[in-house]
Amino acid sequence: MRDKAGYMGVEIPISKIKELREQSGAGIMACRNALLETEGNMEKATEILRERSLFLVQKKAERSTTQGIIEAYIHTGGKIGAMVEVNCESDFVARTDEFKELAHHLAMQVAAINPQFVSREEIPEGTDIEPEQVCLLLQPDIKDPTKTIQDIINETIAKVGENIKISRFARFELGS
């Protein structure tokens, strides 16, 4: 017998759906359906959700981002600081904890790694610069080096359902 989603009688425990939701940030039904499609295989379900969220991110990429916040971070000792302007589509999302945490994380990244540009497109033509070293979006994340900053932003886009962009940032270091 098939359920409403058209799947044969595979029982997916609520605990497994909850675990996948916590890992991915995806909605309950998306997690349930991914687990049903993979007959409960967490790794395959995670990959399905990742592919779907990337598709959604690409669909949202052209949307206007006129709301957002400016986040500041001062490193312990007060000798290094950073500010970052992160934009989204609505003030509702700008007030969410997920968005605020992302902005804070990005400010910490700027303070720690000192990027020069937001994206590859900002690098002047003809310069011999390694984009992964100087572009914030291409840098490995300070908390999880297996992901880039763009990956972290994409995950947040999938969670909040809106386009997110970094407009600009500044880094300050005492004595420089």
Label the model's feature ranges.
Residues R2-S176:
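N-terminal assembly/interaction segments in proteins that build large macromolecular machines
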